[in-house]
């Protein structure tokens, strides 16, 4: 972002992945294209299986124990605080990962965890070239569940033996333990369900610990028929991934352009989860004068996602987590409520099958021993967790060349992210049925303004002393706003708006606003002697609003050396050695990303509570002025 360098002359540690490698992978988030391609870069995805979820990226391990270890993302020279998944991977020319202090020290207070530079495509001189790309794929759960018991008969036999041994251990005789264990298989303190039809006067499990050979799977309870279902098949699916991109590029010696539109629909492995992205980008560059070049790059992306809540690894104990339910539920429980003839009972409004929550509501005296009141497959149909994003990323720049080898570039970058979430907990089934349903609206807006001035000068002395000088100034201002509201007791069953709730006393709202500002001046000097010996020195003085006014400025530097032994006389005759480089670097980096949700740690924070005209303020955080 702060200039370019040849690989042979570069003294820092960096790795690059080009467009061909990125496009060769069917990934929704460009960061997944880094997986397995670079030493020292770890890419891991959340376990929830939601399409469009950005992976966790760690460059040379964890950079902070208590702070955030996320690297800094820079898109076309400007810090990018949005979701990388909003970028169309087909618009990316290259991604460069800066790993060490020599490479990242120039980024000051934000570069401690490494830097990922993303360069988007630009126009190329020549006739207009139109490219259309269409891709189809499938998403499948690759990591299967643990080897568990899937046969209902085997499960009942093991459960019987465990209970029988328990009764024997507490003093029951063999006959009593046998009878007690059989009865306990069905009650609420055992497994809660009897899914077998056994002839009158007989027990399900014999004294030999095996299933009664006269038992048949399936049992009628009044108007209901009970039989186990495959929860895996009822919860997971193979999702279709489809992507279409159209781009046009071309230009002349003085003018070039690049434009693209794209559409992506990525269905998840959990029923009801998907991610849709409509993307567009246009970039132009015009050489107005021999000494003046103007350019701009504007991208607008619209995203719509359905993301069932409670599916991440941190929610594994949640009753909404499909992975937890499917991995742990016994193979004896029904997924659906059935009529006595075995057909599905259907919802009167949607005609969808009615799901069994294991709470005894439909199947009297049958209460599931595991996760009673939960059925994630039903939640995927009747609940809503819909996210909408509109993202604008725009840059305008001008480069002047007042004298030979001196370029001065001024850039203005503007970023806007409007995100809305519509959340609905249905009023008929599940956790929110007793409340009459639940509705929530969340809205957030993130705005960023970046101003940057860079001066680059190159000079060669005596044909072997190559020097490169860079001096720059950068300011970044970010503002984020959020507003959230929720209510209970829905009027319209499918309405997610708060004004669709009838219980005014239970309506709640919350909101907030934060600002974040950085200022920095920086410079770098590169020296190259005869393409054999290299040296680089960089310095940045940075200020961050996250620290106390007395401690906001910090100094960051790096020194690096390099030697390409392949250019020495004693190795020049070895044609199979084209680069043999030894590098060493030392530097200091900063990390102002402390994971602050609302306000800096250096100020006192009071929580305002109460619903009357006068409310109390309780001290929630005691500020530390030394930060």
Regions found by a protein language model. Name each.
Residues 184, 190, 195-249, 254-260, ...:
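Outer-membrane beta-barrel transmembrane strand signature
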Residues 54-58, 270-272, 307-308, 421, ...:
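Short secondary-structure transition/capping segments
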Residues 1-281, 286-289, 293-295, 301, ...:
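Short, small/polar-rich motifs associated with maturation and membrane association
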Residues 145, 149-211, 301-364, 477-493, ...:
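A surface-exposed, glycine/aromatic-enriched loop/edge motif typical of exported proteins
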Residues 10, 22, 59, 106-107, ...:
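Short clusters of hydrophobic/aromatic residues that line enzyme substrate/ligand-binding pockets
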């Amino acid at each position: 972002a702060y200039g370019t360098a040849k690989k042979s002359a570069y003294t820092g540690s960096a790795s690059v992945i080009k467009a061909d490698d990125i496009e060769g992978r069917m990934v929704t988030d460009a960061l997944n294209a880094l997986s397995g391609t670079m030493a020292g870069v770890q890419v891991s995805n959340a376990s929830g299986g939601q399409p469009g979820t950005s992976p966790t990226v760690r460059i040379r391990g964890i950079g902070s124990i208590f702070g955030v270890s996320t690297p800094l993302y820079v898109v076309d020279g400007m810090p990018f605080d949005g979701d990388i998944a909003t970028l169309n991977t087909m618009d990316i020319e290259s991604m460069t990962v800066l790993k060490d202090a020599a490479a990242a020290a120039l980024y000051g207070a934000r570069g401690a965890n490494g830097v990922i530079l993303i360069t988007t495509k630009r126009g190329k001189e020549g006739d207009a070239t139109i490219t259309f790309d269409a891709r189809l794929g499938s998403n499948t759960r690759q990591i299967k569940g643990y080897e568990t018991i899937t046969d209902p008969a085997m499960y009942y036999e093991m459960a019987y033996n465990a209970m029988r041994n328990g009764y024997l251990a507490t003093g029951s005789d063999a006959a009593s333990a046998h009878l007690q264990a059989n009865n306990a298989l069905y009650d609420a303190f055992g497994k809660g369900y009897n899914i077998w039809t056994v002839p009158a006067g007989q027990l399900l499990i014999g004294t030999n610990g095996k299933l009664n050979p006269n038992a048949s799977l399936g049992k009628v309870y009044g108007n209901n028929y009970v039989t186990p279902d495959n929860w895996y098949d009822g919860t997971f699916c193979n999702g279709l991934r489809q992507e279409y991109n159209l781009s046009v590029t071309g230009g002349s010696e003085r003018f070039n352009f690049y434009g693209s539109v794209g559409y992506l629909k990525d269905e998840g492995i959990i029923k009801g989860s998907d991610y849709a992205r409509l993307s567009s980008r246009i970039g132009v560059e015009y050489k107005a004068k021999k000494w003046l070049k103007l350019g701009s790059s504007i991208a607008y992306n619209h995203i719509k996602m359905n993301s069932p809540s409670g599916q991440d690894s941190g929610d594994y104990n949640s009753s909404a987590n499909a992975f937890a339910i499917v991995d742990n539920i016994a193979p004896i429980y029904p997924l659906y409520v059935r009529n006595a003839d075995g057909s599905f009972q259907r919802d009167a409004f949607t005609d969808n099958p009615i799901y069994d929550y294991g709470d005894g509501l439909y199947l009297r005296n049958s209460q599931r021993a595991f996760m009673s009141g939960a059925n994630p497959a039903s939640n995927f149909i009747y609940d809503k967790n819909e996210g909408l994003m509109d993202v604008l990323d725009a840059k305008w720049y001008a480069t002047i060349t007042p004298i030979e080898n001196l370029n001065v570039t001024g850039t203005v970058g503007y970023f806007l992210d409007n995100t809305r979430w519509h959340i609905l907990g249905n009023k008929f089934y599940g956790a929110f049925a007793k409340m009459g349903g639940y509705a929530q609206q969340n809205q957030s807006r993130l705005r960023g303004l970046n101003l940057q001035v860079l001066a680059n000068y190159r000079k060669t002395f005596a044909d072997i002393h190559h020097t490169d000088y860079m001096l720059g100034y950068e300011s970044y201002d970010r503002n984020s706003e959020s507003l959230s509201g929720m209510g209970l007791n829905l009027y319209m069953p499918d309405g997610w708006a708060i004004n669709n709730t009838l219980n005014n006393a239970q309506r709640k709202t919350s909101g907030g606003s934060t600002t974040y500002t950085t200022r920095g001046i920086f410079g770098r000097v590169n020296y190259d002697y005869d393409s054999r010996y290299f040296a680089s020195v960089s310095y940045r003085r940075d200020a961050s609003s996250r620290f106390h006014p007395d401690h906001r400025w910090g100094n960051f530097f790096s020194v690096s050396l390099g030697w390409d032994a392949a250019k020495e006389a004693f190795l020049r005759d070895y044609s199979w050695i084209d680069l043999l480089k030894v590098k060493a670097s030392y530097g200091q980096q900063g990390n102002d990303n402390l994971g602050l949700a609302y306000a800096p740690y250096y100020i006192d924070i009071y929580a305002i509570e109460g619903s009357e005209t006068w409310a109390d303020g309780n001290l929630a955080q005691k500020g530390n002025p030394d930060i």
